[in-house]
Structure formats: structure tokens, C-alpha cells
């Protein structure tokens, strides 16, 4: 009887690994420093650095309807209730299956309660609990 070729029997050779790291979370934004050999050629900017002058200027204060200057948006927006946390997470992570649960939580709980112990990051639109 002949054996049928199965891809599961194939073994990878130990020396045939790719030189490109497969951990995209190891970047300058994550705070985890990758080894020097991953950062590119010495003297050249790494792949995580942007060209100088490419960043947007900081947002300036906007004039409001009553003439006073309104400061730019703060880094975090407060969230009124934990039910809104579920709503924000579902919208951010694109989980429509959890959306009815979030709406039900919002109906069952009194949304006029005091502020919760977390804040919503406007950039990521994800719930971030406050450090205790």
C-alpha cells in the first residue's frame, strides 16, 4: 500500500526561518524595545520612525459660538456609565452580536448614575480603566 502525501508530515528545517520578525507589537509605540538587529541598518531611520515634519501640528483652540476660546479636546473623554463601556467596545471591535446586550444593559441600568471608574480614549475608542 502506498502512502498518501500529507502536509502535516513535513518538518521545517531549523535554519530556514525568516529573518523578518513576526511580532508587529514590538514597535516604538508599544514601549517594548526589540533587539538592535531588528531595527534596521545603522544610520538609517527605523521602520517605526516617521520622516521629520510629517506629523500633524497640535490642534489649536477653537472659537466657540459665544466668542470664548474652547481648548482642544483632552486626551480622554469621561464615560457616564459602565453600560456605555460595552457599547463603545462593541462599536470599536466590530462585534455586532454583543450590541443588543449593550443596549439591554443600558436600558436595565440607570444611565443617570454617577460617573464610572474608567475613561474612553478618543483615538482608539476603547475602554481604558483608570489606574488604581
UniProtKB/Swiss-Prot annotation:
Tell me which tissues or organs this protein is expressed in.
Expressed exclusively in heart.
Q: List the disulfide bonds.
A: none
Q: Where in the cell is it found?
A: Cytoplasm
Q: Which domain of life is it from?
A: Eukaryota
According to its record, what are the GO cellular component terms? cytoplasm
Q: Report residue spans for region: Disordered.
A: 17-75
The reply to whether Transcription regulation figures as a keyword in the UniProt entry is: no
- In its UniProt entry, what is this protein called? Uncharacterized protein C11orf21
Please name the source species: Homo sapiens
Phylogenetic placement of the source organism: Eukaryota, Metazoa, Chordata, Craniata, Vertebrata
Amino acid at each position: 500500500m502506498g502512502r498518501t502525501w500529507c502536509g502535516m508530515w513535513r518538518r521545517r528545517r531549523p535554519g530556514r526561518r525568516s529573518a523578518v520578525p513576526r511580532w508587529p507589537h514590538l514597535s516604538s509605540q508599544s514601549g517594548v524595545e526589540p533587539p538592535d538587529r531588528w531595527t534596521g541598518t545603522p544610520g538609517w531611520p527605523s521602520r517605526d520612525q516617521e520622516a521629520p515634519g510629517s506629523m500633524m501640528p497640535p490642534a489649536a483652540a477653537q472659537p466657540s459660538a459665544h466668542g470664548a476660546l474652547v481648548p482642544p479636546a483632552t486626551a480622554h473623554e469621561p464615560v457616564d456609565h459602565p453600560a456605555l463601556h460595552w457599547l463603545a467596545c462593541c462599536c470599536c471591535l466590530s462585534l455586532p452580536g454583543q450590541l443588543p446586550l449593550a443596549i439591554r444593559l443600558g436600558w436595565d441600568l440607570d444611565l443617570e448614575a454617577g460617573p464610572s471608574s474608567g475613561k474612553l480614549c478618543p483615538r482608539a475608542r476603547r475602554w481604558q480603566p483608570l489606574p488604581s
